Amino acid sequence: MITSEHITGLILAGGRAQRMGGIDKGLIPFHGKALIESAISRLKPQVSTILINANRSITKYSHYGYPVLMDETPDFSGPLAGFSVGLKHCKTPYLLTSPCDSPLLPTDLAEKMASELEGNHLELVFASSKENDGKIWSQPVFCLMRSDLQDSLNSFLSKGDLKIDRWFKELRSSSVLFENSQAFANVNTPEELSALEKVLS
């Protein structure tokens, strides 16, 4: 049975945040503290340890007491670059990933994903959510993967492909449905930040 002791959490804070004017999203003030702190507090009980993937503000992120890992690929290559460096430094059998700007991430994220992965002998599972209109949306940056997938990912990246869904298709993978779509709400614009703050006010 997969438990929290078998899982390392990886918080992705390495993006450009172009729609936020290029500011570092993880450090945006949110209810009196940096946005990443909400992700840390929700992820921490679900994992044995945490890694942070960031490409700037390294000193500030290091103040949280967790290893801060920079991409080893150039030019902000997206979440797969973060996955790659996270897998390289993961010392547990599984890696659970989450973006830094989703302060409502599910508190049962690891539990539900571990059950799906283990029960169906999968290599990777990712979240999906049901929206108010009934549509199912993929949430691929929220995923649980075996930590022995580094060679597979590096081989994929060596082809110059950065599309997360295409890598998933090369694996034994599946999605896990979460009914609360708001749990995956993230911050891409100032308006979305304001809306999220109102949810928690």
PLM feature spans:
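Nucleotide and nucleotide-moiety/phosphate-recognizing core
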Residues: I2-D161, R166-A185, P190-A195, V199-L200
